[in-house]
Amino acid sequence: MNHVDRDLRTLQMSKTAAAYPPSPYSSPLGKANAESHTLSVLVDNEPGVLARVVGLFSARSFNIESLTVAEVAHETHLSRITIVTSGTPEVIEQVRHQLERLVPVHSVTDLTSSARAIERELAMVKVRGRGDSRVEALQLAEAFRAKVIDATTESFIFEITGAPRKIDDFVDLMRPIGLVEVSRTGVAAISRGPEPI
């Protein structure tokens, strides 16, 4: 590579870097103080809304760890987007304020800060199972209250529902037995008590 090609490549890389802002997750300070937060976003159920919400995260280099969307009020055409993201308190507050400014957004609630939220997730976990590992997989499934939803002579598919941490633990314990793959729904969350989110 000659010096002209190298200079051109450097110029292209600097333009690309300028087009994408630095991630708030990339600083060592940001990682040290980063906490996981579950945001509940009530939006109009119309085309393009999810793309606008996800675009806000993408444009600012915010990571989405989990995302679920469903209509919650058919008569008023409202949907709830549940987003799990990590960041410093300042980053989460910035995300919340930017979401609130989007036109189709009715409300944004940080369910993590209320400490009154219930979070659940469903996962289907496929595991190889022969001989002793078959017995071990079934014992672990029973301990975690996972249901067998499919079984062959060589594998199982378990269905497990619970807090994300419980599912993480179940998956980690299945790895040495013969974990094949996992499909997760993402987090669904709701606040406790009689009041709506």
Locate predicted features.
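Regulatory modules associated with amino-acid/nitrogen control
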Residues: 1-197
